[in-house]
């Protein structure tokens, strides 16, 4: 599977365990660079944006390859919308 810069991805990292939703910048032998938020914050993040409340922004980060357990493209599946589609439906904004 080929990933491109700008793809919306879900990254699972270890040591410590993290799940991130973000916009991929690059993948290199050394690691992954992406603009992301913690996936556990997604619902609160969307709610805060809709309510016009203060919220954390996506941040640019580099994750060394030894921490990357899995990288998946954020895609819809059957009746389940992608995280990016859910974000757009809930906030009226595009992710990325």
Model segments located where?
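Conserved RNA-binding domains used in RNP assembly and mRNA/RNA metabolism
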Residues: 1-96
């Amino acid at each position: 599977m080929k990933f491109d810069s700008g793809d919306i991805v879900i990254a699972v990292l270890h040591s410590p365990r993290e799940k991130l939703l973000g916009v991929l910048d690059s993948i290199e032998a050394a690691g992954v660079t992406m603009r992301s938020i913690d996936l556990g914050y997604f619902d609160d993040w969307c709610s805060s944006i809709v309510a016009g409340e203060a919220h954390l922004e996506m941040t640019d980060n580099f994750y060394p390859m030894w921490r990357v357990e899995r990288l998946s493209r954020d895609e819809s599946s059957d009746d389940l919308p992608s995280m990016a589609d859910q974000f757009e439906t809930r906030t009226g904004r595009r992710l990325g």
